[in-house]
Regions:
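Q-loop/switch helix immediately C-terminal to the Walker
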Residues: 80, 87-102
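ABC ATPase NBD coupling module
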Residues: 63-75, 83, 89, 93
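Hydrophobic anchor residue at the start of the ABC signature
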Residues: 133, 145, 161
């Protein structure tokens, strides 16, 4: 179980963006974070994935803190994939960061072999996001955090990416926490909704 208990987080000396936030996510559960824009959904996603340390509270998996070294069992798929990859690294190498390249994973996401030798700026946002999803899943996470991962993509690419991710998290019994401003997407995917 992924648990956040009493999370408080502030940027600098400002007012807390998160204050006393708690939630629990079981394996196989699909939780939507819901709140108006600017109220801490992305911040909470980053705290859950271990990218930000809370000012107060803690994040645990099965009662233990997230590991500080090695591959984290919580993987995040960012809204802007170009910010999640090294712009000077070819994408095949980026994908291999998570371990051996799983051909079924690559094929299922529609990643073409010729894209492996390209740099991030040479692909569209949808193509690049496919690499980010493949890298997150290749790490064999127990939980995936998806922060508006399809917002900037066309409707067809959104549908393909979400269908693939849903099949994978179900097959692997991975817990999913996602942020989306689409009520239709939330209704279709979420097993639970957490209001911040």
């Amino acid at each position: 179980m992924l648990a956040a208990e009493g999370i408080r987080y502030s940027y600098g000396k400002g007012a807390p963006v998160l204050d006393g936030v708690s939630l629990r996510v079981e394996s196989g559960q699909r939780v939507a974070l819901s709140a108006p824009s600017g109220t801490g959904k992305t911040t909470l996603a980053r705290v859950l994935a271990g990218y930000l340390a809370p000012d107060e509270g803690r994040v645990t998996i099965d009662g233990r803190p997230l590991p500080r070294r090695g591959v984290c069992p919580v993987q995040m798929i960012w809204q802007h994939p170009e910010a999640a990859v090294d712009p000077r690294m070819r994408l095949g190498r980026t994908l291999a960061e998570a371990g051996p390249v799983d051909r079924a994973l690559v094929g299922g996401l529609g990643i073409r072999d010729e894209w492996m030798d390209r740099f991030p700026h040479e692909l569209s946002g949808g193509e690049l996001q496919r690499f980010c999803i493949a890298r997150a899943l290749a790490a064999e996470p127990r939980f995936v955090i998806a922060d508006e991962m399809s917002t900037m993509l066309d409707a067809l690419t959104q549908a393909q990416i979400w269908r693939f991710l849903m099949d994978e998290v179900e097959r692997r019994e991975v817990g999913l926490v996602f942020v989306s401003h689409s009520p239709a997407l939330t209704e279709r995917i979420a097993t639970d909704i957490v209001e911040l």
